[in-house]
Amino acid sequence: MQLRQIISLFVVLIFCAACDTSLMVQSTGVLRDASRKFELRNGNRSVIYIPMRHLGTRVYYDQIQRAVDSLQKSGYVVFYESIAYQVDSAVQRDVYDRKFRKLTGNRLGLQQCIETPGDTVRVLRAPLYRKLGQRIISQPDYSFFLVDYETAVNADIPKNKLLDDFEYIYGTIKLEPCDYETPLDAPYGCKPIKAALKNKFDKEFIMQKREENLASLVADAPQQKILILFGTAHFKGFLRNLQARDPRWVKIK
C-alpha cells in the first residue's frame, strides 16, 4: 500500500471515529437546551416532574433554574433525587463505596440513565460539541437551581440503605483484597460480581425500589403542589407506581 493510500485511509478512520462520537453525543440528549416537563393532576393536587440529566449544556441547566425558581414562588415544593449516604463514619462510607463499585463497576446505575465516566470523557472531547461552541457540564448541585432547602424533600433512598436491602435479600457482597487495594478513583480491574446480581441491583434497587419510594412519598404527601427533580429514566416507573396507588392521578402533558 502506497504512502498516499495509507494517509487517506488514516484520515477516513479518524473521520468515522469523529462521526461515531458525535452521534453518541447527540443520542445522549446532552446538547438539548430545552428541558421537558411532565404535569400530573389528581383533583386539587398538582405534580410537575422535570426529568434531570447528569450531563447537559449550561443553557439547559439555566432554564431548569428559572423554572424551579418560578414554580417555588407559585407554591410548589421540591422533591429531589439524592442517594447521598447516611452513615456515621468515613470508614463505613469507604466500605459501602467498595461494595457499590463491586456491584456496578464504577457505574452509578443503569448506563442509559446515568452516564459512565468514559462517556463523560468522550462527550467532552467530541468534535461536534466543540464545533457548536456549547459547554457541556455535569449536573450542578441543587443549590444552583435555587432549591429552598427549608421546604424541600429528599425523595430518594440513601445508597447505604439500597446496599443493605440488597444484601438482606441476596447475601453479603464479599470484598476481596483487590477491592481494598484498588483506590476508588482508579480503573476497576478486580474480579466482578456475577452479572445476574448486577442486573438485579440495577433493576430492582437502582430503578424499581426508588421509583416505588418516590411514588409513595408523593401519594402520601400533604403538599398540594409538588415539583419533582428526578432522573429521566425514572418517570415511567414513578407514574406507574403512583397510578397503582391512586388511579385518579392523570398525566396532563
What are these regions (language model features)?
Residues 1-7:
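Bacterial N-terminal signal peptides that target proteins for export
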Residues 7-9, 61:
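A generic structural micro-environment signature
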Residues 21-205, 216, 220-223, 251-253:
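Structured, acidic catalytic/metal-binding patches in enzyme active sites
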Residues 63-66, 213, 233, 237:
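Extracytoplasmic/secreted proteins, especially bacterial periplasmic and envelope-associated proteins
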Residues 204, 208, 219-253:
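A cross-kingdom marker for long, charged
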